[in-house]
Amino acid sequence: MDPTAPGSSVSSLPLLLVLALGLAILHCVVADGNTTRTPETNGSLCGAPGENCTGTTPRQKVKTHFSRCPKQYKHYCIHGRCRFVVDEQTPSCICEKGYFGARCERVDLFYLQQDRGQILVVCLIVVMVVFIILVIGVCTCCHPLRKHRKKKKEEKMETLDKDKTPISEDIQETNIA
C-alpha cells in the first residue's frame, strides 16, 4: 500500500512539522551569513559629517605594466599597435582583427570566415534553390515520358481491340456423359 496515496492511513502532519522546523533552523543559521545590508559605521570616514573629503585623501599613483612605445619601435608592429612592457623593457603588439603573432605578421585565416549563422542561412537558401531546380527538372523530364507511355498504351489497347475476336454466346450442348 502506498503511504502517499489519497486515503492512506499515514498522516503527513509529522512530515510537515519536520520540514517547518528544518526551515526555521536553516533561516536562523544562515541569516547573517549572506546579506546585502551595508555595514553600519559609527563615525564618518572623512571626519566631520558633510565635509568634502575628496581633496584631503592622497591619490595613489596607479602602476601599470605597459607604457607607450619609444620612437625607435614606431614600426615594430606590422598590423597592430605597439605597447612597451615596463617590467621586461620589451615592445609588445596589440594586433588588429585578422592578424596574430609576436609582431602581428601572420594572417588568421579563420578570421576570414563569416558568422556561422550567416553561413547556415546561405546554405539553407542554396539547398532550397537546388531542390526547386531539381523538382522542376524531374517534372520537365517525366511529363513527356508519361505522355509517350500513355500514347503507347492507347495504341496497344486499340490494336488489342482490333485483334480481339468476338465470343459467341451460342453454346451447343452435347450429351456426353
Swiss-Prot record:
Found in several mouse tissues including kidney, uterus and liver, as well as in beta tumor cell line and MCF-7 cells. It is not detected in the brain. It comes from the Eukaryota. This is Probetacellulin. The gene is Btc. GO terms for cellular component: extracellular space; membrane; plasma membrane. Residues 32-118 are extracellular. PROSITE patterns: EGF_1, EGF_2, EGF_3. Residues 1-31 form the signal peptide. Keywords: Cell membrane, Disulfide bond, EGF-like domain, Glycoprotein, Growth factor, Membrane, Mitogen, Secreted, Signal, Transmembrane, Transmembrane helix. Residues 154-167 have a biased composition (Basic and acidic residues). Residues 140-177 are cytoplasmic. GO terms for biological process: apoptotic process; cell population proliferation; epidermal growth factor receptor signaling pathway; epithelial cell apoptotic process; ERBB2-EGFR signaling pathway; ERBB4-ERBB4 signaling pathway; negative regulation of epithelial cell apoptotic process; positive regulation of cell division. Residues 65-105 form the EGF-like domain. The chain crosses the membrane at residues 119-139. Disulfide bonds join C69-C82, C77-C93, C95-C104. GO terms for molecular function: growth factor activity; receptor ligand activity; transmembrane receptor protein tyrosine kinase activator activity. Monomer. Interacts with EGFR and ERBB4. Growth factor that binds to EGFR, ERBB4 and other EGF receptor family members. Potent mitogen for retinal pigment epithelial cells and vascular smooth muscle cells. Glycans are attached at N34, N42, N52. It comes from Mus musculus (Mouse). Residues 153-177 are annotated as: Disordered.
